[in-house]
């Protein structure tokens, strides 16, 4: 029998209109103190894991009760995820820390179809969620009452620097970039792609965070949890395969010129990093103040290139959402996306590929970005992001039509009664196209255009593509 255990925490909210408080995210002049209440459904007598696969919290926002549903992001890390740092004498130290039982979640607000959430539950709730079209941040308060949290809007954070923050990419930035020419009708791709990414934190990051590698690691995880969520909408699985921290000094000369730094980082990645850590893309994270308003730079349309599948990103804000959006932007350039024009829209807010960081940050790509990405996939066809990860590569939650298989398997051997799968060989039976999935019926792919997932709220239906068992996400989702 399932019993619902209510973790009894006072469900109260005390708005501090017009007051100011110093938080990790900065000085906030309008916020609420809330006490989230966790609701856990466990079998009677079951031992509660440290970090459950799914969690639910009740709290008040603007005095109104909301329910936050969270699900552990099991696609965040690759199973061979590794971390590298350096001893004072320069020795390379590489470890494979256990990451399966991590504390990073994605989620939504109950009864709000347009809501999203990216939350760290490591020490209280820290992150951001979208509610009724507005972005809110949440973080624990460092008070004697450890359950108190602050909830506030991004615009209520006092800005020390009002200068615009921009990406440094221009159409003529790189001689090696040839604009993609339309040679035939564009084919909209619904196949999932997989980007295996390494983040490199330079020595200034070590100095900025007082040599605390754990803090740097946590910061990168928070950023990457949001990046992973952002790209899910494009049916791209971005997984963190490695983190390298230049703890004893930089391996390149990190300069204020973003162009020079990007070139040096790409060269180092090709001759050093790639030879010891397989990956599709690498991003350098640095507090270095680049020249002018630039906070990031990347090559355009270079995913899988040994040197140029790279970007550099300034760690310019204590708000992980802003740094995550910037890194997602630079990865977007690597995936063939150009900057949004004025007519490219995301429901009234600036989109991911806007050349300027918006006062109202968005986690959405514009339709223009989808067109750029599909065009790039059609005419450049980067091969490294086509391979479907195996369980030896990616830790991910199995979902209908998208099971992750062991090496050599075509279907899940754990289902001996499946008429489409030979349980002895883990191969599809003769004549079978598939064994399971929302678009698999009687061992055959369902016809293209068959609805496989009904829309919820203002969302859009998802359709089978006729060539796979999975139910691909509709590329026109908001």
From Swiss-Prot:
Gene Ontology process terms (BP): proteolysis
Binding, Ca(2+): 196, 280, 384, 387
SUPFAM superfamilies: Blood coagulation inhibitor (disintegrin), Metalloproteases ('zincins'), catalytic domain
Disintegrin domain ranges (all copies): 397-478
Tissues and organs where the protein is expressed, per its UniProt entry: Expressed by the venom gland.
Top enzyme class: hydrolase
Keyword Secreted: yes
Transmembrane segments: none
Domain of life: Eukaryota
Record's cofactor remark: Binds 1 zinc ion per subunit.
Cited Gene3D superfamilies: Collagenase (Catalytic Domain), Disintegrin domain
Signal sequence range: 1-20
Record-linked PROSITE patterns: ADAM_MEPRO (PS50215), DISINTEGRIN_1 (PS00427), DISINTEGRIN_2 (PS50214), ZINC_PROTEASE (PS00142)
Extent of motif Cell attachment site: 456-458
Active-site residue list: 330
Keyword Calcium carried by entry: yes
Binding site for Zn(2+): 329, 333, 339
Propeptide residue interval(s): 21-190, 390-413
Keywords assigned: Calcium, Cell adhesion impairing toxin, Disulfide bond, Hemostasis impairing toxin, Hydrolase, Metal-binding, Metalloprotease, Platelet aggregation inhibiting toxin, Protease, Secreted, Signal, Toxin, Zinc, Zymogen
InterPro entries: Disintegrin_CS, Disintegrin_dom, Disintegrin_dom_sf, MetalloPept_cat_dom_sf, Peptidase_M12B, Peptidase_M12B_N, Reprolysin_adamalysin
Cofactor: Zn(2+)
Primary localization: secreted
Residue ranges constituting the Peptidase M12B domain according to the UniProt record: 193-389
Known partners and oligomeric status: Monomer.
Family: Belongs to the venom metalloproteinase (M12B) family. P-II subfamily. P-IIa sub-subfamily.
Name of the protein described by the UniProt record: Zinc metalloproteinase/disintegrin ussurin
Organism of this sequence: Gloydius ussuriensis (Ussuri mamushi)
